[in-house]
């Protein structure tokens, strides 16, 4: 018996949380409520196919989720640029991954299976991609993404910023003052010095952003800067001698003002003498991490290069899991939060027009979002199927 009625919202949300991410973006136009739901970070984080880390080896790329069980999945590499050679660097910004592949880079949204290759104007063996960002110009509605890289024009000469504009597909060079760049300590598009944080704007200028709360650090101390709750910074420091971990977060959200009004506050301290070193300078391996409420989740490599996931909470090591399926040692890794951000000018795999999901008592099938109705079939074993047509406008 067909009835024109709506399912309970919590059930509807549960069904949508099982829809493949490649179709979620298309479904934004179904109704305002769905559009608002898909823009909600809580929905994205609770999606059945979400993950928190990305690891790259010589030949494969993996996603790792911790919910709370650690699950490792191999991500498909449908872009020739991702398959061609070992990645030099791996960065994540706003749901996009930047993979430095030596002779260029690939910008990738693994959740949406979209990618785009960035080709160099000329071969620059010394060029390193450092990150991806966008102009913080509120007067422009469309976000213009840019990548930041650095290279040495000639042996012994000073470094030069190289900035790629996605919209125009053009490159801009900007020379760097010799005293303002150190290749060893650059992390993404920010540079962590011993006592302060410097940033590079996308016009190639270099600014001191703020002082760091960690004070003076030893050479083998782990020091990692990450985004906290989307609009703030967090800083992790592990003392090489005592293994003590301390985390600070910025009190207020970060804006585009370069100044000294950034205030840090102590967020977490963990003292576990048996905690392994999170940094291995020989291989330039820094930890990746995220903070979930009062739980600290870290991805790091041990002294043999094997990848591990450590979950810390309540001043104790809750669990540690070796990622056995990641075979190659010393993988690149980064924290990654999925999003529905489209890769500018990117190519997407063709999604199937109809997908079906199995629940214990529910079979949900849908067509592309261009059809403004969804048919849901409810099935209870031993009884006849019934259909409910849901109409949205």
From Swiss-Prot:
Q: Output the InterPro entries linked to this UniProt entry.
A: F-box-assoc_dom_typ1, F-box-assoc_interact_dom, F-box-like_dom_sf, F-box_dom, SCF_F-box_component
Question: In this protein, which residues make up the domain named F-box?
Answer: 1-47
Q: Which residues cross the membrane?
A: none
Statement: the UniProt record of this protein carries the keyword Membrane: no
Cystines in this chain: none
Answer whether the UniProt record assigns the keyword Cytoplasm to this protein.
no
Q: Which keywords has UniProt assigned to this entry? A: Kelch repeat, Repeat
Query: What lineage does the source organism belong to?
Result: Eukaryota, Viridiplantae, Streptophyta, Embryophyta, Tracheophyta
Put simply, this protein is called Putative F-box/kelch-repeat protein At1g32430
Tell me where the Kelch repeats sit in this chain: 151-199, 308-357
């Amino acid at each position: 018996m067909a009835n024109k009625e709506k399912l309970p919202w919590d059930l509807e949300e549960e069904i949508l949380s099982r829809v493949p991410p490649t179709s979620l973006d298309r479904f934004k136009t179904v109704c305002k409520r769905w559009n608002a739901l898909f823009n909600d970070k809580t929905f994205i984080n609770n999606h059945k196919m979400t993950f928190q880390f990305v690891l790259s080896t010589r030949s494969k790329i993996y996603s790792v989720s911790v919910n709370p069980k650690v699950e490792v999945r191999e991500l498909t590499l449908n872009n020739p640029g991702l398959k061609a050679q070992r990645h030099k660097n791996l960065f994540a910004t706003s749901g996009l991954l930047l993979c430095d592949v030596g002779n260029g880079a690939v910008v990738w949204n693994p959740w949406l299976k979209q990618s785009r290759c960035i080709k160099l104007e000329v071969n620059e063996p010394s060029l390193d991609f450092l990150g991806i960002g966008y102009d913080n110009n509120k007067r422009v509605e469309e976000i213009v993404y840019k990548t930041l890289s650095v290279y040495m024009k000639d042996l012994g000469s000073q470094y030069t910023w190289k900035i790629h504009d996605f919209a125009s597909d053009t490159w801009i060079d900007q020379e760097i003052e010799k005293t303002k760049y150190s290749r060893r300590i650059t992390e993404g598009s920010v540079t962590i010095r011993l006592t302060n944080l410097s940033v590079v704007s996308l016009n190639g200028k270099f600014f001191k952003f703020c002082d760091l709360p960690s004070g003076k650090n030893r050479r083998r101390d782990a020091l990692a800067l990450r985004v906290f709750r989307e609009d703030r910074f967090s800083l992790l420091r592990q003392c090489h001698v005592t293994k003590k971990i301390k985390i600070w977060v910025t009190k207020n959200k970060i804006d585009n003002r370069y100044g000294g009004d950034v205030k840090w506050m102590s967020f977490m301290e963990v003292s576990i003498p048996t905690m392994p070193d999170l940094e291995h300078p020989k291989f330039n391996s820094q930890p990746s991490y995220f903070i979930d409420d009062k739980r600290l989740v870290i991805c790091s490599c041990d002294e043999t290069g094997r990848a591990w996931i450590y979950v810390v909470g309540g001043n104790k090591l809750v669990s540690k899991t070796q990622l056995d399926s990641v075979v190659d040692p010393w993988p690149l890794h980064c924290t990654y939060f999925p999003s529905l951000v489209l890769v500018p000018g990117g190519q997407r795999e063709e999604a199937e027009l109809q997908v079906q999901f199995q629940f214990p008592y529910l079979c949900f099938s849908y067509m592309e979002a261009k059809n403004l109705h969804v048919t849901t079939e409810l099935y209870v074993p031993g009884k006849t199927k019934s259909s409910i047509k849901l109409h949205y406008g």
